Amino acid sequence: MAHFAQLDENNVVLQVIVIHNNEVGNLDFPESESLGVDFCKAHYGDDTIWKQTSYNNNFRKIYAGIGCIYDPVADIFAAPKIESP
C-alpha cells in the first residue's frame, strides 16, 4: 500500500490516504510518487497538493500525520510546532 499526504497552501498536512500499489504501478518511491499524485488528483481534484509518505521506510524523515508540515527545501515532513503557554 502507498500513503499520500494532502497538503494545504501552507504545506500543512490535511489528511493521509492509502492507495493500492497497483495504482502506483507497483513501483517504489520515488518512481511511484507521480503516479500516486495523479491518482489522488483524479479523485480529490486537480487543484489539490499531494506528497508520498511512508511509515515503513520513513523517507522524508517521518511519516506524515495531520498537522505535520512539509518542508519543500529539505523534502521532509516535520512534526507540528507546539507553542508553549
Language-model regions: role of each:
Residues 1-85:
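Interaction-interface detector
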